[in-house]
Every structure is written in C-alpha cells, then in structure tokens.
UniProtKB/Swiss-Prot annotation:
Intrachain S-S bonds: none
Domain of life of the native organism: Eukaryota
GO BP: any one term: in utero embryonic development
Family stated for the protein in its record: Belongs to the UPF0575 family.
Protein name: UPF0575 protein C19orf67 homolog
Organism this protein belongs to: Mus musculus
Length: 301
C-alpha cells in the first residue's frame, strides 16, 4: 500500500481549522424558478396574441382586451422581485450580485418588451386605448420597484407608445417613453412617516424644434434627441383644493437633467442612468424635493 505524501498530513490541521467551505447554489439552480415563471408569463402573453390573431369570435377578443389590465397586474409581483433583487441597496447576493443583477435585469427587459408588444398589438386592432387622458386606457404599465436608500424608493413605468409630455402638448414636440416615481419618506415628529413623490421621465424631443423650425419646413429626416428630466410643477398650489378640482391636468415643465443622444436607451440602461443622476446629484439620503431647481440643474452631456 502506498503511503500518503507527508505534505497531506501537514495540510489537514489547516483544513480542519477553516472548516468546510460553504456550499454555493449554482447560478443555474438559482435562476431556475425565475426562468420558469418567465416562461409561464410569456406563454400567457402568447395565448393572448394567438386568440387575437386567429380567433374569429370578436366577443372573445373584446373579453380578452378587458382582461389585459388584469394580466399586467398579474406580472407586477414578478417585476417587483426582479428589480428589487437586482437593484436594491444593500445588495443581497454578495459577491455574485453583479452576475445575478445582469441576469435579472435581462429577464425584466425581456418581459417588459413582450408586454409592450402585446398591448400595441391589441391597440392596433382597436381593442385597447393608449390615450393617457382616458382613465380606462393602458397608456403605461408598472415594471418594478426598488430602493436606493432606506428612505428612497423608485417605481418604474413604461409607456406602450410615446406620449405627449402633457395633454396640452407643452413643452412642444416633447414625448415621454418611461416614468419613474421617486418616493421619499421622512420621519415626522408626531404623525409618523410622511412621504413625497417626485416624477422623472425618459423623453425625446424632435430635433427641428431645437433648430427653431416647424414641422412644415423641417427636413424629412427628423431625429429624436433622448434625455432624462424631472417634472417641474407649475401649479396649482398643493393646499389649494378648489383649484385642483377644477384643473383638468396640472401644468408642468420639463427640467432636463441628462442628454443621452439620438439612440433610444434600453429599458435597463435608462433606469441605470436615472439611478446615477439621483445618487450623483442629491445623494441617497437627501430628498430631491428639499432642493430647489438650481440644486438639481445639471449641464447636458
């Protein structure tokens, strides 16, 4: 019988001292239930599409269109998990966080684009309204929520088709594609927690507006200049209840914070850029509503 090398016995006390290595769940096993749920939701979306394209029963199509908001709501807990697990601070997966983050956000983007495609298809057949001023429309849908600090939560919404920034089309030629609600919670001394919401948008502006030209005499190739900005309310005052009741839509302006360029950013990249803006300008512990417009102004880059 061969004797074990002497070096083996010298390493045994070290191994015993360190103890057994902690078992790591393989990434494939970790993602298995997540991808299973994705496949389930994608199959549901395929069913909605198949009935629309191949069924001759118009009543059934109308019923499915009415069920569309329910299906989108059914996807919300999944989006909540994906975005919170990928982006929330502090990270929950340790050294694997970046790999997990990339995988989760790819899944989130895949489902987001599929749902957008489905809603647009139903709208093209006249079964779904995309007009934001209609309370029964599906102009946008919820795509997740995550925390950037204990007192700051970000909710993501995506517009199925670019919508005018306001119903009054002011600012002119400005269209929104995504919205983020930044909810800031502050501790009130006697009444518990208080919260405030700021709104941020991914928008594009037709470039002939910047050149001082109108649609009638602009060049045929109109480019879209993408940016991220913040909703700046112009009234009514928060405590003026009568004015709020009589106001069809509160007026607001667009405070551009970051110029992105002529290529539309992906769903994931746009949210990454917003997080950089929030953390870089105000810091995760400072509510943006406490800063005036000058404190939030950023040079376009």
């Amino acid at each position: 019988m061969m004797e074990a090398p002497a070096s083996t016995s010298s390493r045994e006390p070290l191994a015993a001292e360190l103890g057994p290595a902690p078992a790591r769940l393989p990434l494939d096993s970790m993602f298995s239930p997540i991808t299973d749920q994705l496949r389930y939701l994608l199959r549901k979306a395929d069913d909605f599409q198949s009935y629309l394209l191949y069924s001759r029963d118009r009543v059934q199509k109308e019923q499915l269109a009415k069920a569309m908001p329910t299906f989108l709501t059914m996807c919300e807990p999944y989006f909540l998990y994906l975005e919170a697990a990928a982006r929330s601070v502090p990270p929950i997966y340790g050294a694997l966080q970046e790999l997990v983050r990339k995988g989760l956000l790819e899944i989130s983007q895949q489902l987001t684009l599929r749902l957008e495609q489905l809603v647009l298809m139903y709208a093209s057949f006249g079964f779904v309204d995309l007009e934001e001023t209609n309370p029964l429309s599906i102009s946008c849908f919820f795509c997740g929520r995550f925390s950037i600090s204990p007192s700051h939560d970000v909710s993501i919404f995506r517009y199925c088709t670019p919508a005018a920034y306001t119903a009054s089309h002011f600012p002119r030629y400005l269209y929104k594609k995504m919205r983020w609600n930044l909810e800031t919670t502050t501790e009130a001394s006697s009444q518990g927690a208080d919260s405030h919401v700021d709104y941020y948008f991914l928008c594009y502006r037709d470039t002939w507006e910047d050149a001082g030209q109108g649609p009638a005499n602009s060049c045929p190739q109109i480019q879209k200049l993408w940016s991220i900005g913040r909703w700046m309310p112009l009234g009514p005052a928060e405590d003026d209840l009568d004015s709020w009741i009589l106001c069809p839509q509160p007026p607001g302006d667009y405070q551009q914070l970051l110029t992105i360029g002529f290529e539309e950013p992906s769903h994931v990249l746009a949210t990454d850029l917003l997080v950089q803006i929030l953390l870089g300008q105000a810091g995760p512990a400072r509510p943006p509503s406490a800063a005036g417009p000058a404190a939030w102004a950023a040079p376009a880059s």
